[in-house]
Design a protein with these regions (language model features):
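One-carbon transfer enzymes
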Residues: 1-183
């Protein structure tokens, strides 16, 4: 199952990657934003969607729905809310996130999307990348599963950096998910 808050390009990429893989099934997409494009992308790809509020996430409503699905893995792909401890504790080592930087750099609260890419640019970094990590109770501090770097010293805008990072995300995130689920 996938959790997302926004456009959902990673979600769609993951769904399409696993269509022809009988060992892995994307069972649902949970979204906290009722106007997010990810909802349309999931529906277009015949994946059920559950929309919930921040209050439902904080209470046991989302936990109960997730538990009922018995997921082997919960994948955060552009999900912008912090998960409650009750959800993390119910699924130890079964929740992963992708972050658009090489953690521990540019992680933590408020560091997502363009904010990360702008910080990379502002600090004249020569490289950035992606990190896939387990989720714990602190933003972007879970155990690192996978990292991949890319040179960005030729980039002059945060948008150029974002484009390069998205290529990495789309290439490697589904493969990392597959490795975790088929070990």
């Amino acid at each position: 199952m996938l959790l997302a808050s926004g456009a959902g390009s990673n979600v769609e990429n993951i769904i399409k990657y696993f269509v022809s893989k009988p060992t892995v099934q994307v069972t649902s997409v949970f979204c906290n934003n009722p106007t997010a494009k990810v909802i349309d992308r999931a529906i277009e790809n015949h994946v059920p969607v559950v929309v919930f509020t921040k209050e439902e996430l904080k209470s046991d409503v989302v936990l109960d729905k997730v538990t009922a699905l018995e997921p082997d893995l919960i994948v955060l792909a552009g999900f912008l809310l912090q998960l409650p401890a009750s959800l993390i504790e119910a699924f130890p080592s079964k929740i992963i996130n992708i972050h658009p930087a090489l953690l521990p750099k540019y992680g933590g609260k408020g560091m997502y999307g363009q904010f990360v890419h702008q910080a990379v640019l502002d600090n004249n970094e020569k490289e950035t990348g992606i990190t896939v990590h387990f989720v714990n109770e602190h933003y972007d501090e879970g155990e690192v599963i996978f990292q991949k770097s890319i040179a960005v010293d030729d980039c002059t805008t945060a948008e150029e950096i974002a484009t390069k990072v998205h290529v990495l995300e789309h290439e490697f995130f589904p493969k990392v998910i597959e490795q975790i689920l088929t070990i």
